[in-house]
């Protein structure tokens, strides 16, 4: 990992020299590169494991529906990169597989996602200390979160099984990240 950090540092320094960036701009560029590399690594691990366990499409449908809502609803993050990897594997590889394997009843899934939709309506967007949401964007993000959730619900009615359950799972997982219990007092 140290070698990757060194390469990021070298590339950020190169960009700083090439574009006459001040120190703050350099730090922003370096952080951006670190985030991209970290997210790429998490994606490779998650989808690599999904391929190994033959759950790629299950993972993809769950993850895409989760991400589409999260794009505007935001929500809690894992406390560390390792915990993020573990949560990704549990929530986007193991849980979709279990959902399909046990053939969870659609009535149960729609009941759970109804509660999740209420959580999205009530709590979205949910800012964090590291990722605050400007007040002028809050209403727009709330509306987009609700609209995307409704569109995904409509798609779930049209999608074949097990993909409808996986779409509903993605919505439900995202709605759970909005709960205030996942935010320290100072983040609220």
Curated annotation (Swiss-Prot):
Its EC number is 3.4.-.-. Its main location: membrane. One of its GO terms (molecular function) is peptidase activity. It comes from the Bacteria. It is an enzyme of class 3 (hydrolase). The chain crosses the membrane at residues 49-69, 100-122, 143-163, 164-184. GO terms for biological process: proteolysis; quorum sensing. InterPro entries: AgrB (IPR006741). Keywords: Cell membrane, Hydrolase, Membrane, Protease, Quorum sensing, Transmembrane, Transmembrane helix, Virulence. It is found in: Cell membrane. It is a multi-pass membrane protein. It holds the Pfam family AgrB. One of its GO terms (cellular component) is plasma membrane. Essential for the production of a quorum sensing system signal molecule, the autoinducing peptide (AIP). This quorum sensing system is responsible for the regulation of the expression of virulence factor genes. Involved in the proteolytic processing of AgrD, the precursor of AIP. Belongs to the AgrB family. This is Accessory gene regulator protein B. It comes from Staphylococcus haemolyticus (strain JCSC1435).
